[in-house]
Amino acid sequence: MNKTTIFYKTQNILIEKLEKQSNIEVLKERNFFAKIFSAKKIPDIYFHSGSLDDDSKENILNSKITIVNSFAAMNEIIARTKISHEKIRVIYPSIEVEYKDPKEIKVKICEELQIDNESKIIFFTAKNIKSSGVKEFLDICSSLNYQNFKVIIAGNNKQIYNLRFQIPKYPNLENRLILLEDYKNIDELFLAADIFILPTYNKSFSSNILKAMFCECVVFVTIENDVREVVDVFASMDSSTDPSIAFKIDAILLSEQDFNQIKKQNRELALEFTLENNLVKINHIIENV
């Protein structure tokens, strides 16, 4: 059986699944001696991520298909390499969350954290909470007029330790803020949350927004991030300090019907990007290489 060869710079859950298929061969990064004594193998499919360096350009120009995770990345590659649209495909990051009834999970989390179950939960987490806008997140939450809400920030021990020094600047959040260090089941926090805000300065596609949508959260994210391609105008922040976001959040929290409708719409949209659906998309591409 002829195998389809793939190469990637960074592994993700979709690639992990592909590697287990019998029709796939993964080309490994060449060591120093291989670079000197053997010709470089060009993959059939190249999964591009990160900077567009010379090696990346070579793979893009010579592979049959390049996969990227946003149209912004696709457009940049086309502009800088002049390859045709036919040689590049967009597959958004995959969602792999064990979906459970958000209402049941919220009851569980509220009991665990001693929160009133009627409170709205506004959630924030990121790999790098500083560059993802944790200060701006706190600024937004402290500007809300709506009263019955709790704020949860989850991060690793070092992130939360450093963040604690900033908390005294937000006295009106003193009784509303919960900081969680190295929380084991982050997915359950997404399921329990009502709103997920990411005032990030990072451009790279935030898969946490897709995860939050899948878990029926109302989301807000800056237009600097490539995930803007899948959210609507209401969810878009002009900048990390967009002054209109607090007003939007107040408005949506006061309209239960609109609030629930957005949560439902977000989940329906995010279902397209489950790992199972993305696996179907990439295998369709493989079949037609």
Model regions: which residues?
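Conserved acidic donor-binding segment of nucleotide-sugar-dependent glycosyltransferases
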Residues: 233-243, 251-257
